Amino acid sequence: MESGYLENERPGSNVRTWVEISLERIATNLEAIRRRIGKGTDVIAVVKANAYGHGASVVARFLRDQGVTSFATATLEEAIEVRCVVPDAQILVFSGCDSGQEPRFRGHNLTAAVFERGRVPDVKIEVEVDSGMGRLGVPHAQAGSFLAQLRNRLAGVYSHFASADADVEFSRFQLKNFLSATSGVGCRRHIANSAGLRFPDAHLDAVRPGLALYGIAPCPAVSDVRPVLSWKTRILSLRHMSAGESVGYNRTYIASSPRVIAVLPVGYADGYNRAFSNKA
């Protein structure tokens, strides 16, 4: 992929293929999420992995202009990039604070995830509770006493659904575990990812949409969002085919009648999956 543009920009004639990001659709998706959660719940915008490939700096700046005051990233480096464009927002780093990173966390006013009892850095922290995901977090059965020890330091406490898009029963089991473990903590609590938006009782103090912000519906129950990214190119050549003629590797397409086909200057190196052959 050669370039990325906002939807209202236009690439030069020398650009072969590009993506366009619609900020208007990001705003529409954000509004759909806000309608679902109501005014008493905040949005923590997940902008990890370069905002899922949509451009973290552009997306974070735009979301801040839309009133979003909390963000989450996977790494410290991502968080520092986001901090440059949202100087007054809260930023949670999911991978936590490694030894020696404390000065950078404090210098950029970042919040570190804590997911092990023995790793509590001297920075702003949110504790992750393992309510059933089994990946990271203090086990929910042990979380109560641990949170009590850190009560005066906590900026928040959170958990992560394992299968909110498919397994309703297990998701409710996780929510029950999380609520029990965090009762009375006195700080913000959040567990709902994009798929978790389907559970009103999981909205709590904040929700953490990622895919939904970018218009990827995580499940049929959360389908009121629209894709933000469009991949575009120019037609390289138009070709006329007769019935029975083939085109492409392995002759994957054979014309059943006369056809006019467009050849596009896009290939595997641009990210086009070979599995899409004859399925576009």
List the predicted regions and their residue ranges:
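Active-site-proximal beta-alpha core segment in soluble small-molecule metabolic enzymes
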Residues: 2-5, 13, 17-28, 41-190, ...
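Active-site anion/phosphate-binding pocket segments in diverse small-molecule metabolic enzymes
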Residues: 2-31, 35, 42, 78, ...
